[in-house]
Amino acid sequence: GSGEILKLSAAAFTGPDKKIVTANPTFESIARHASVAGADVVKIDLASDYSHDLKKMLAAANGAGLVYICNPNNPTASITPAKEIADFLGKLSPATIVLVDEAYHHYVESKDYESVIPLVKDYPHLMVARTFSKIYGMAGLRCGYCVTQTGNIRRLRNHQAFDSVNIMALVA
């Protein structure tokens, strides 16, 4: 579903001179795509409570093209509160894109969780990936979407093939 967004983000925002910072463990797809793009992959271990260690991720993000936060995290199901992500965004260089992958947001029942989509209007360097694959049972259709500001969409589109979304997914 959102795999295309992860692939395009790695192509658009990482490379030999732009590393990616991600958690460990987390969903590995984007790290693989960034590695193919020639980027250094910096993995920051989760904190002892399995949350993202945003302080260490911030320290590692100097010169990064992309920071990836899977929220809720896959495979740990840990969540990072939106306020903590907002604080992180405020401290991070606006030249570094933050991609928050909310593929499993439909399954969260914790009162501590909220989507970061409302933050997109205030943070031009924030992108949020979502998928229809999980809750809607559309895994085979490979359809997802990205919420971000226009400039980031333009950069993604520069790397997108004309047929990256199949006709069945578009109809669905």
Residue ranges of model-derived segments:
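Conserved core of the PLP fold type I
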Residues: 1-93, 104-122, 127
